[in-house]
């Protein structure tokens, strides 16, 4: 028996591959693959799937595997047949990692074991991605043993549905894409200056008024507008449907209600929540706006708490994202109520941050306490570090990596999502035909990021919980452009999230991702092809 790490050269040397052979060169890269002696497993119509558990989640894993096999090969397994070879899904409490799995491939059986149904699901995904994408009567799986587990417990992707609204069929397809890449968190950005996308029963004007903008700027801040009303929002039933669809694929949906800034959608509906009283309108162009929630108005806190009460009733996630980014405090500086609140609380500028920054920290901490009373914790963008932060807060480090480092120093957990590596609204290649937010982010750069260097301080290693890619949608309209911006960079991020850093290799990734690109094409995902081109 020869132990190998899954790399292109070693796998090709160890396991002979033919058109209808399974290929264990998958994305993300498993921690280890061992080529075993013995005859291969031959998948054919007489193969059966045995779920060694009465657990509903395990049964669903079996159904997914059957669907994936038919999807890739055209082979429809006979559930009633008991005479052929078997793929067995089973739980194994001896596996250490909650999301880890072991696949053992022998002549008569393929066994996928996990400590939890979630781990088994990731094993199913690996088997799925090893399948050849062609119609076949049989597929040969070389004898092998795969032992795998994730590097990070948080592996996320954010979709901004506030600047541009995406319909339910796309949301589900997006979730399917996450599942394919072993991503376990869907961060759903739902409110913005340009539109409020969440049904809240207590405040119907949020969707009656706040979800609609009269028009949208054309191009990159041209001053020209399309004169076309734009809107859309998700009902509670639709959001619950998304939560269920994601949960079936072991993905947690974390909603974001951004505050106190990026709130013109809400202020247009309820102007009394702003410092000036309005009138306000839903933003028709992109950027940051000075009007934010009034932190000196008790009705603001009542509004926020009531909204979040309805949010936690829809979303069972441990975390609720409450934003905290890009909140200009100029209105607070001149607002009598905000200044009175600063005086009442005895807030003063310190450590380079103003009294108004301390007021924002107070605001965020009040929201955190309310959510903690509901059994939840908050996530916020790294601006929330501009003041004293509630100890249960998790920080998303987006303005580079320093936010994550500072959070760790304060004993706070952090998720690394720096713009220079993980902002997928950036260009992937020079292209004058496309209008995007700007900057260049090729897949090589995304792949090369290491959120926790080997020589990192122990505090950093302890508190960095994972990574996340973000798709902001100022210039992303529709399914095709969304997938073009997402892939293959989501795959690059996913490998960083899953695979130990010392096992990553970009040349290997390119080969493996080129195979996965065939599956993207099968789904009709029009992805950026720059990675797959032969370099001259």
Listing of model-derived features with the role each one plays in the protein:
Residues 266-272, 281-394, 398-409:
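Active-site neighborhood of glycoside hydrolase catalytic domains
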Residues 96-302, 306-319, 366, 370, ...:
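Feature activates predominantly on carbohydrate-active enzymes
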Residues 20-154, 481, 497-528, 532:
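Contiguous, structured surface segment used for ligand recognition
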Residues 377-393, 398-536:
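Flexible, acidic glycine-rich loops studded with aromatic residues
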Residues 57-58, 165-167, 193-199, 260-266, ...:
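Flexible loop/turn segments at secondary-structure boundaries
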Residues 1-25:
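Bacterial Sec-dependent N-terminal signal peptides
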């Amino acid at each position: 028996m020869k132990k190998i790490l899954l790399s292109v050269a070693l796998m090709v040397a160890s396991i002979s591959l033919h058109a209808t052979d399974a290929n264990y060169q998958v994305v993300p890269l498993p921690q280890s693959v061992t080529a075993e002696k013995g005859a291969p497993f031959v998948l054919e119509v007489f193969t059966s799937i045995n779920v060694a558990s009465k657990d509903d989640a395990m049964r669903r894993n079996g159904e997914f595997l059957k669907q994936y096999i038919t999807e890739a090969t055209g082979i429809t397994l006979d559930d009633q047949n008991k005479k052929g070879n078997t793929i067995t899904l089973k739980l194994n409490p001896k596996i250490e990692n909650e999301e880890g799995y072991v696949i053992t491939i022998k002549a008569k059986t393929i066994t996928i074991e996990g400590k939890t149904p979630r781990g088994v699901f990731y094993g199913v995904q690996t088997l799925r991605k090893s399948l050849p994408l062609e119609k076949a009567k049989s597929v040969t799986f070389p004898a092998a043993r795969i032992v795998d587990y994730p590097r990070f417990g948080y592996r996320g992707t954010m979709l901004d549905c506030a600047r541009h609204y995406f319909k339910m069929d796309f949301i589900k397809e997006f979730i399917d894409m996450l599942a394919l890449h072993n991503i376990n968190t869907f961060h759903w950005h739902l409110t913005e200056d340009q539109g409020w996308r969440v049904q809240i029963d207590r405040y119907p004007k949020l969707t009656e008024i706040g979800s609609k903008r009269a028009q949208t700027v054309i191009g990159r801040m041209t001053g020209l507008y399309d004169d076309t009303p734009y809107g859309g929002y998700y009902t509670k039933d639709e959001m619950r449907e998304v939560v269920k669809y994601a949960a079936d694929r072991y993905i947690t949906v974390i909603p974001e209600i951004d505050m106190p800034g990026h709130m013109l959608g809400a202020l247009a509906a309820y102007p009394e929540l702003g410092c000036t009283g309005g009138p306000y309108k839903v933003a028709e162009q992109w950027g940051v706006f000075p009007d934010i929630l009034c932190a000196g108005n008790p009705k603001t806190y009542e509004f926020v708490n009531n909204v979040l009460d309805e949010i936690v009733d829809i979303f069972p996630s441990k975390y609720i994202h409450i934003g905290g980014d890009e909140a200009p405090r100029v209105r607070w500086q001149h607002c009598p109520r905000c200044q009175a609140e600063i005086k009442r609380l005895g807030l003063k500028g310190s450590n380079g941050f103003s009294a108004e920054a301390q007021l924002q920290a107070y605001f965020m901490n009040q929201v955190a306490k309310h959510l903690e009373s509901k059994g939840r914790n908050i996530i916020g963008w790294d601006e929330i570090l501009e003041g004293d932060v509630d100890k249960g807060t998790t920080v998303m480090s987006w303005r580079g990596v320093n936010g994550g480092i500072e959070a760790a120093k304060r004993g706070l957990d952090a998720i690394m999502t720096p713009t220079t590596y993980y902002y997928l609204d950036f260009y992937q290649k020079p292209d004058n035909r496309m209008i995007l937010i700007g900057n260049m982010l090729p897949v090589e750069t995304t792949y090369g990021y290491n959120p926790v260097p080997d020589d990192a301080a122990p505090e950093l290693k302890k508190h960095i919980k994972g990574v996340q890619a973000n798709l902001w949608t100022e210039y992303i309209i529709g399914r095709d452009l969304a997938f073009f911006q997402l892939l293959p960079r989501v795959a690059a991020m996913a490998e960083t999230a899953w695979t130990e850093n010392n096992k990553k290799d970009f040349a290997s990734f390119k080969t493996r991702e080129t195979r996965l690109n065939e599956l993207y094409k099968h789904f009709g995902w029009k992805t950026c092809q720059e990675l797959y081109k032969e370099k001259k």
